[in-house]
UniProtKB/Swiss-Prot annotation:
It comes from the Eukaryota. Belongs to the vasopressin/oxytocin family. Keywords: Amidation, Cleavage on pair of basic residues, Disulfide bond, Hormone, Secreted, Signal. Mesotocin is produced by magnocellular preoptic neurons in the hypothalamus in amphibians, reptiles and birds. It is found in: Secreted. Mesotocin is a diuretic hormone. GO terms for molecular function: neurohypophyseal hormone activity. This is Mesotocin-neurophysin MT. The modification Glycine amide is found at residue 28. It comes from Bufo japonicus. Its main location: secreted. Pfam families: Hormone_4, Hormone_5.
């Protein structure tokens, strides 16, 4: 094999193995550290847009509670196609990277649980 073919093969493999795009980076990859200045609020959802998306099938709001896999959550699936990360809720809670969704409820992108850290007095502190 000539040196030229070897070099082309090497750089070809290098190009294929080092690509990392926003939507498909591996955990711990080049873009795994999120710049918290770039995190935006997740899109509104639910009746009269009074809630916020916590996952592709979860919409929660203080006034309306939480919806799971209903027509109120359809808009949340749009988040999968947006290039920048988002965050709903203000106070972190739970053991799985969740945020307080409403009084007493902690949600991450997959599920919601009851959490005393999210009681009414401290939800937005």
């Amino acid at each position: 094999m000539s040196y030229t073919a070897l070099a082309v093969t090497f750089f070809g493999w290098l190009a294929l193995s080092s690509a990392c795009y926003i939507q498909n980076c591996p955990i711990g990859g080049k873009r795994s550290v999120i710049d918290f200045m770039d995190v935006r609020k997740c899109i509104p959802c639910g009746p009269r847009n009074k809630g916020h998306c916590f996952g592709p099938n979860i919409c929660c709001g203080e006034e309306l509670g939480c919806y799971f896999g209903t027509t109120e959550t359809l808009r949340c699936q749009e988040e999968n196609f947006l290039p920048s990360p988002c965050e709903s809720g203000r106070k972190p809670c739970g053991n799985n990277g969740g945020n307080c969704a409403r009084s007493g409820i902690c949600c991450n992108h997959e599920s919601c649980t009851m959490d005393p850290a999210c009681e009414q007095d401290s939800v937005f502190s």
